[in-house]
Amino acid sequence: SMFPFSSDWHISYRDHFSYAKEINRLKEAYKDKIEILLGYECDYVAGVSCPTKEQYPEEVRPDYLIGAVHYVPWEKGYLGVDTFFDKAREQINGVFKGDVKKAVQEYFACEREMLRDGDFQILAHCDLVKIQNSKKAPYPLFDENEGWYRDSIRETADAIAKSGVCVEINTGAIARGKLGVPYPSLEMLEMLHAKNVPITLSSDAHSTEHIDYAFDQAVELAKKAGYTEFMYISGGRSLMQKF
């Protein structure tokens, strides 16, 4: 999405209109063969950007919106959650005075704020911060088995259930060789299942060859957590499909 700012990984304001125009052209051209939807992944940055459909002009308004947290602002700086390990470590040292626990807790706090204030249908990679425990990292940034971390995902699972959004099982980090498992973790997915939170499948593809990457692994994880169906959007409605 063009919000909150223009960068290599945010579409520019100018290009947003041509992108939406092309998607809407393809919708019409292929309407007898496939249903095409216009959707964006929009960043939540406290005080800067919140994923809501109303912020988009009518000609680029999406059929659905995915809410995501990639940036954790704190005092005079921010943590880029999905950045390289060394950069994240540097930002935590500078912005959070080296307090990894505080940085991770603030990430989940930002996610809960977005769930409270946003207007979107799907929550993106809801434990993205574990990317810093990547198999490409020199060492894990934190221990996902510690009580404070499990408390954070439990509190966030409660907020997700209260908000009514759908959670994606996201295989993007597998495709890009950073993790061996999808987002979210099995433990968090089990919490979500217990609260009747619907799920959907997402490859978070950055290239066409990854469009359905590791979906078999995502389905296996979903079933292990107790899920038997997933959500998809069609005709402006959220529908359920058995695996």
What are these model-predicted stretches?
Residues 1-87, 97, 101-105, 210:
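A metal-dependent hydrolase metal-coordination microenvironment
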Residues 2-3, 64-160, 166-169, 173-176:
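Divalent metal-binding pocket/active-site signature
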Residues 22-32, 54-63, 115-119, 155-164, ...:
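Acidic (Asp/Glu)-rich catalytic clusters
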Residues 34-45, 78-91, 118, 168-175, ...:
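Short secondary-structure transition/capping segments
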Residues 35-39, 63-66, 121-123, 164-168, ...:
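Structural preference for beta-strand elements that scaffold enzyme active sites
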Residues 129-131, 136-243:
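Charged catalytic cores and adjacent phosphate/nucleic-acid-binding surfaces used
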